[in-house]
Regions:
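N-terminal lobe of the biotin/lipoate ligase/transferase fold
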Residues: 1-95, 211-214
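Contiguous, small/hydrophobic- and glycine-enriched helical/loop subdomains that border
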Residues: 80-121
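Flexible, glycine/charged-enriched surface loops at secondary-structure junctions
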Residues: 112-120, 246-261, 336-340
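Internal, well-ordered alpha/beta segment that forms a basic, Gly-enriched binding/recognition surface
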Residues: 113-117, 123-180
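A conserved active-site cap/scaffold subdomain adjacent to cofactor or substrate pockets
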Residues: 158, 167-192, 224-252
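Active-site- and interface-proximal helix/loop "cap" or "latch" segments in soluble metabolic
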Residues: 180-183, 302, 306-348
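Intrinsically disordered, low-complexity terminal tails and inter-domain linkers enriched
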Residues: 189-229
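Structured beta-strand/loop patches that form or line metal/cofactor-binding pockets in enzymes
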Residues: 256-303
């Protein structure tokens, strides 16, 4: 596996680079660590206008970009750290998320954090979501990526993202802000807890016995020394990089010719209105359903009882070609039960 940094906080460029590596650097496996500044990233199958607070996006000059993977909308700023695994797999579409999530959870747990998976595509710490992940497949290769909320402006995320009231009701939460958390804050709590527990042990036993009881000897103190008093994101970046590249990993640079191709993908795809907003559809009928795999919605235009146009949206993840499914509906008579059955089949 080789390591690549984007050296950019431009979301349109970063997603273009990711796509280029997935589709063209097929000779090896890659790890990327990167950041986007002041950006909403929309899932591939989502209705952009339904996911953003358009007034706030304009007011705060927020970038909006659609990624190539499924899942839900997320806010990125320079308090986030994003990671991507791009690997060759013999049976790519059967690769479970856990293969890629495990090393991230392992690294977080080494810091004393109670990290675990929640559902199919979230990482939580003490009930707070700190990461959402997604993946897609391309000719025997897998792109798996996720965002780690380290010190994000959560109030900004809450303001610029629009959450469907049905989703909030289903999850039993009141807002984006109430269900996500920052690793830095949770890490501070964990470090303090480790210090208290270590001090209590030392008061009762010898220092050696206390260290043995802690599992990772004095891990809290070690991380305070490594991260510094401010627990900065650059220190967390360096820590995560060291954990994920512990077995030795060559850092790779793209050639000028390759970088020109990345710019071409950025300009012609990710930095266009058509890609980021163009899937939206004014509808006569909206059918919406929630399954364990996520939310799915069909927006349908009718002409004399027949389907004139259709779009399928959602925060689910699927390798199926939604465009082909949408096209297959055009010209058919509209029957509610058939649409509901189709939506169920899409997310299976």
């Amino acid at each position: 596996m080789k390591y690549i940094e984007t050296y950019s906080t431009n979301p349109y460029y970063n997603l273009a680079l990711e796509q280029y590596i997935l589709e063209n650097r097929t000779d090896d496996d890659y790890l990327m660590l990167w950041q986007n500044d002041n950006t909403i990233v929309i899932g591939r199958n989502q209705n952009t206008y339904a996911e953003i607070n358009a007034d706030a996006v304009v007011r705060y000059k927020v970038n909006v970009v659609r990624r190539g993977t499924g899942g839900g909308a997320v806010y990125h700023d320079l308090g986030n750290l994003n990671y991507s695994f791009i690997t060759r797999e013999a049976d790519a579409e059967k690769i479970a998320f856990e293969k890629f999530v495990y090393p991230i959870i392992k690294a977080l747990r080494k810091l004393g954090l109670n990290a675990e998976t929640s559902g199919r595509n979230d990482i939580i710490i003490d009930g707070c979501k700190v990461s959402g992940v997604a993946q897609r497949y391309y000719q025997g290769r897998v792109l798996h990526h996720g965002t780690l909320l380290y010190n994000e402006n959560l109030d900004m995320a809450n303001e610029v993202l629009h959450v469907d009231p049905d989703k909030i009701k289903a999850k039993g939460v009141k807002s984006v802000r109430s269900r996500i958390g920052n690793i830095r804050e949770l890490l501070s709590i964990a470090l303090i807890k480790n210090e208290i527990e270590a001090s209590a042990d030392i008061a009762q036993k010898t220092a050696d016995e206390a260290a043995g009881k802690l599992g990772n000897p004095a891990e809290g103190r070690k991380m305070i020394e490594q991260f510094g008093a401010d627990l900065s994101l650059p220190a967390f970046w360096a820590y995560l990089k060291s954990e994920l590249t512990a077995d030795g990993m060559q850092q790779e640079q793209l050639t000028p010719e390759e970088l020109a191709q990345v710019e071409k993908i950025k300009t012609e795809k990710y930095d266009t209105w058509e890609w980021n907003y163009g899937r939206s559809l004014e509808a006569d009928i909206v059918r919406k359903a929630h399954y364990p795999q996520g939310w799915i919605e069909a927006r349908i235009q009718l002409d004399h009882g027949r389907i004139k146009d259709a779009r399928i949206y959602g925060d689910f993840m699927t390798p199926k070609d939604l465009t082909q499914i949408e096209q297959s509906l055009i010209g058919r008579e509209y029957h509610e039960e058939e649409i509901d059955k189709l939506l169920e089949d899409v997310v299976k």
